[in-house]
Design a protein with these regions (language model features):
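Catalytic cores of alpha/beta
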Residues: 69, 73-87, 179-182, 193-217
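C-terminal helical cap(s) of enzyme catalytic domains, especially alpha/beta-barrels
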Residues: 54-57, 101, 109, 221-253
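Conserved N-terminal beta1-alpha1 strand-loop-helix module at the mouth
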Residues: 1-64, 140-161
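Glycine/Thr-rich beta-alpha phosphate-binding loop at enzyme active sites
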Residues: 129-180, 219, 224-226, 231
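Glycine-rich phosphate-binding active-site loops on the catalytic face of alpha/beta enzymes
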Residues: 41-47, 83-98, 157, 164-166, ...
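Short beta-strand/loop segments at the ligand-binding rim of alpha/beta enzyme cores
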Residues: 8-16, 56-71, 179-198
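Active-site mouth loops of central-metabolism enzymes
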Residues: 11-26, 70-74, 125-147, 198-202
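Conserved anion-binding
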Residues: 76-160, 246
Length: 253
């Protein structure tokens, strides 16, 4: 069975992302994990340490859903996750974020990688003001460039996930529409990629709109606001309504 099959990736519509560098009370973490989300993703950009990642993973040890780690640094290469999502920054201006860091890591720990749990994820880091964009030297793509990036990740590389990330705020609606349209065409031709979106999802309306355009929404920064648990409930309600009413996300036709 593939890594995607092991974690039921095809059924994910709502994912929460928790940052090891932004601690939450243990009870809050427990409530998030048991909320009904489809998966929990551990990941971040800044000040990651092995101890922080392990601490958060330990708090999620009883989660009833898959707990996955976004491997953005060697500190994230710890045992115990259900899957490891390896980011390929498709629009990076520095090739170390597309292949360089990956080769360095594989040279160090490649013999111990649990390949049955590894998925490559094509990231399109579209908000130039985000920490991830600054680190990866990623510029905001035009609509034409975005279409090419989706076609490259989904059509050429056949990645299981293409992730449109607009961390910190909402992406322009037209940008998400372009990504969804390109991915639908590739999937209709036999492609397998799923489209994730993360950025600015802070309540029912923003979640519901994105669920009409993409396969999976990722709720992250808003969980750390004073309304964090309320945001979680609202976005899950949007997911449930989308499932009940048949919102297509990225259908095959």
């Amino acid at each position: 069975m593939t890594a995607a099959g092991r974690i039921g990736l095809a059924g994910w519509r709502h994912v929460v992302k928790l940052d090891p560098d932004k601690p939450l009370p243990a009870e809050t973490v427990r409530r998030i994990a048991a909320s009904g989300t489809d998966a929990v993703l551990i990941g971040g950009t800044q000040r990651l340490t092995r101890a922080k990642v392990l601490r958060l993973l330990w708090r999620l040890r009883h989660a009833p859903v898959p707990v996955c780690i976004e491997v953005t640094a060697m500190a994230c290469a710890v045992p115990g996750a259900d899957a490891y999502l390896v980011p390929l920054a498709l629009n990076t201006g520095d090739l170390q974020w597309l292949s360089g860091r990956h080769l360095e890591g594989l040279a160090r720990v490649g013999a111990r990688v649990p390949w049955e749990r590894v998925l490559a994820v094509g990231y399109i880091i579209a908000n130039p003001h985000s920490a991830a964009a600054r680190r990866a030297q990623a510029a905001e793509p035009s609509e034409e460039e975005l279409a090419a990036l989706v076609r490259y990740g989904a059509g050429i590389l056949d990645l299981p996930v293409v992730y449109l990330e607009y961390s910190g705020s909402q992406a322009p609606d037209a940008m998400v529409e372009v990504a969804g349209r390109c991915l639908r065409r590739i999937r209709a031709a036999g492609g397998r990629s799923r489209l994730f979106y993360g950025g600015g999802i802070a309540g029912y309306e923003s979640a519901r709109r994105r669920l009409q355009q993409v396969d999976t929404i990722v709720v992250g920064n808003a969980l750390y606001s004073p309304r964090g648990l309320a945001v979680l409930e609202e976005t899950l309600a949007a997911r449930d309504d989308a499932l009940r009413e048949g919102d297509p996300g990225c259908p095959t036709s």
